[in-house]
Amino acid sequence: MAIIIGSDAAGKRLKDVIKTFLKDNNHEVLDVTERKDLDFVDSTLAVVHEVQKNDKNLGIAIDAYGAGSFMVATKVKGMIAAEVSDERSAYMTRGHNNARIITLGAEIVGDELAKNIVKDFVEAKYDGGRHQIRVDMLNKMC
């Protein structure tokens, strides 16, 4: 499993903080916006397309508020994403909704909160079972 991360210019500093945190915790991290100054549309699409290459990959897209990246990610067929700004939502969206991408707002969450959000998202496992009905409903919408 790889954690795919990307940001627009507004999210670059927070992206670097999260990337270091993930690597320090022995996660494989792929930064798809390492040398680019992309718009949130392009940076999020880069994350989504890389996540789609492996069913085990997870993604993190960062912009100023998280909303733009969320809107982009959810436009892609079969992609379930959540805009999160707290640890519980990050954990639950993975466990109950099988979200593969979270979006964060660099102007919304601070460094320590972002690390905790990412930790809970990455460590959570999809529960399946009764939650699969909802996931199937989401996927039928595309």
From Swiss-Prot:
One of its GO terms (biological process) is lactose catabolic process via tagatose-6-phosphate. It catalyses: aldehydo-D-galactose 6-phosphate = keto-D-tagatose 6-phosphate. GO terms for molecular function: galactose-6-phosphate isomerase activity; ribose-5-phosphate isomerase activity. It is an enzyme of class 5 (isomerase). The keyword Ribosomal protein does not apply. Keywords: Isomerase, Lactose metabolism. The keyword Isomerase applies. It comes from the Bacteria. Its EC number is 5.3.1.26. Coiled coil: none annotated. Pathway: Carbohydrate metabolism; D-galactose 6-phosphate degradation; D-tagatose 6-phosphate from D-galactose 6-phosphate: step 1/1. Belongs to the LacAB/RpiB family. HAMAP family: LacA. Heteromultimeric protein consisting of LacA and LacB. This is Galactose-6-phosphate isomerase subunit LacA.
